[in-house]
């Protein structure tokens, strides 16, 4: 079994120092944030997508230390009722998937997202109980009008 760590824990370090620390700690894998809530300190999506030399240097820095990428992470909300947040989250996720494909990274971790209560909502709403019935209606709206269509399109 290979053991790894989420690189976001080491945002106090630069990329090379983070990799050295992880390798010297005896770990095998790193999960790298690409944007959204984990941030993108160690992985600038646009730079890596646009430049093969930068992609090769990025991977060389990792593999030269005997490390592998277990996955990319872009935890955000692609179905947010805030259209700007939703657009940014969707773009980050799609770019992360493209980069994972280019670098043979096997996993992209993300959040499924949380919609608002209805089409007029300004903030996400997370109903956790089926009663009163308004919560069931919110739940149904979120799943059938937001989550399922978004993820079917992405897939």
Model regions and ranges:
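Residues that cap or flank secondary-structure elements
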Residues: 10, 49-50, 88, 146
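Catalytic domains of carbohydrate-active enzymes, especially glycoside hydrolases
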Residues: 16-38, 103-107
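Glycine-/proline-rich flexible loop or hinge segments
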Residues: 38-45, 73-81
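Transmembrane beta-strand segments of Gram-negative outer membrane beta-barrel proteins
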Residues: 1-3, 67, 90
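Glycine-rich, proline-tolerant flexible connector loops at the mouths of alpha/beta enzymes
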Residues: 33-59, 112-119
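Short polar catalytic/cofactor-binding loops
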Residues: 7-13
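Hydrophobic faces of well-ordered beta-strands that scaffold small-molecule active sites
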Residues: 3-7, 28-32, 69-74, 108-110
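Active-site acidic/histidine proton-transfer and metal-coordination neighborhood
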Residues: 17, 56, 61-64, 71, ...
